[in-house]
Design a protein with these regions (language model features):
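Ribokinase/PfkB-type carbohydrate-kinase core domain
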Residues: 1-8, 27, 31, 69-84, ...
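Alpha-helix C-terminal capping segments
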Residues: 43-52, 96-98, 260-263
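Alpha-helical transmembrane segments within multi-pass membrane transporters and channels
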Residues: 58-60
Length: 290
């Protein structure tokens, strides 16, 4: 009922401004406040698996920004950003969990939406095996220049398409990225169907084979699929799980898969590691494992 009243589509992410965000908050009781962010969740997962990782993002020198930075320090993530007092506050995401464990997100990007190429640490990217980006940030102007700078410097790039509506808004740009710039693309089934205008998953498989790069797709209870050149790899989802909160399922899946990829595991083993990580996170509240 709350979703309908506030024009929210279940299981998606809606961008809101600060006024709308505060209005939504005024009608709710907040159960818990935790650090998040799609790629940040993946990076923390990678750190917990023993990888050396760093994160480039943007927060303000305010209460939430300081908590956010400390959460990364606690997880042994090197954070490249000199935060300072800003008029724009740290970004915030309101996550609504319905009884079926689905999550619906309302995001006020705050200063995160103002990340620009000056915020990109060139040395950090040059030293990295791989740079992982999120499609969510394509929703604002300045981050595109930050993305472009990262693409030019990176040794290898991966990106999550993030959200079905995100794909709809930036279809041409995303398709160009997937075809011409990214080495690895992560998407769920709905996102990839929307991206290529497909009516069936068979069309997705054909697209993936023609792509010639690594395309990794999560299919909820149907498991996951990775397509690389002419090969298709599949992994079943884990059964009999106690679903609590689907927030971060894709983020932690990406963490597990990338852990396998950068540690020279096979594509099949990487899918299995991604499935294992996603299965753990959906059985708890929030998008980070303890």
């Amino acid at each position: 009922e709350f979703l309908v009243q506030n024009d929210l589509t279940k299981s998606t992410m809606k961008l809101v401004d600060e006024t709308e965000f505060k209005k939504l908050l005024s009608n709710l009781t907040i159960e818990e406040t935790v650090a998040g962010g799609s790629v940040a969740n993946s990076i923390v997962g990678l750190s917990q698996l023993g990888n050396k990782v760093s994160f480039i993002g943007k927060v303000s020198d305010d209460e939430l920004g300081n908590k956010y930075e400390q959460s990364l320090v606690n997880e042994k993530v090197t954070y490249f950003y000199n935060k300072k007092k800003e008029d724009t506050p740290t970004g915030t995401c309101l996550i609504l969990i319905t009884p079926d464990s689905e999550r619906t997100m309302c995001t006020f990007l705050g200063i995160a939406g103002k990340i620009n190429e000056q915020d990109i640490n060139e040395e950090a990217i040059k030293k990295s095996d791989l740079v992982f980006l999120e499609g969510y940030l394509w929703d604002e102007g300045e981050p595109k220049s930050a993305f472009e700078k990262a693409f030019k410097i990176a040794n290898k790039t991966a990106m999550s398409l993030s959200d079905k509506f995100c794909v709809e808004r930036h279809k041409d740009s995303f398709l160009d990225l997937v075809k011409n710039k990214l080495d690895i693309t992560f998407a769920n089934e709905q996102e990839i169907l929307h991206l290529i205008g497909a009516n069936s998953f068979d069309e997705v498989l054909e697209f993936g084979k023609d792509l010639g790069k690594l395309l990794v797709i999560t299919r909820s209870d149907k498991g996951s699929v990775a397509i690389h050149k002419n090969e298709v790899f599949e992994c079943e989802s884990q059964k009999n799980l106690k679903l609590v909160d689907l927030t971060g399922a894709g983020d932690l899946f990406a963490a597990g898969f990338l852990h396998g990829h950068i540690n020279n595991m096979s594509i099949q083993e990487s899918l299995e590691k991604g499935t294992e990580m996603a299965s753990k996170i959906i059985q708890k509240i929030g998008a980070r494992l303890n």
